Amino acid sequence: MKWWKLSGQILLLFCFAWTGEWIAKQAHLPVPGSIIGIFLLLISLKFNLVKKEWIQDGADFLLKELILFFIPSAVAVIRYRDTLTQYGIDLILIIMISTLCVTLVTGLLTELLLKRKGSTQ
């Protein structure tokens, strides 16, 4: 039974992603459809159109297995050996700096939201 529940939750998450892709394509937006889908999911959660319990296990599963989604990308990088040889150090620096920036912004926003949530309770 758990397998069916998990599959349904993942399907619901993908429905938001697909809807976002469709909106981005139809409206010719410069924003990736996946971002629009995440925004739609956020709004749906905020206004209780979708309950957290409906997606929690599916989201947890996808996060646990996230590394599997990066394997094809990592393998594809091998095709650009010349570029890596020429710009490898620059690329590593860019990746490290951008990862640091994303981590810092995420941490700051999380702290801000938690403080804000704490002050309203």
Swiss-Prot record:
The chain crosses the membrane at residues 7-24, 28-50, 62-81, 91-113. It is a multi-pass membrane protein. It is found in: Cell membrane. The keyword Isomerase does not apply. Keywords: Cell membrane, Cytolysis, Membrane, Transmembrane, Transmembrane helix. Disulfide bonds: none annotated. Belongs to the CidA/LrgA family. CidA subfamily. PANTHER family: HOLIN-LIKE PROTEIN CIDA (PTHR33931:SF2), HOLIN-LIKE PROTEIN CIDA-RELATED (PTHR33931). This is Holin-like protein CidA 1. It comes from Bacillus cereus (strain ATCC 14579 / DSM 31 / CCUG 7414 / JCM 2152 / NBRC 15305 / NCIMB 9373 / NCTC 2599 / NRRL B-3711). The gene is cidA1.
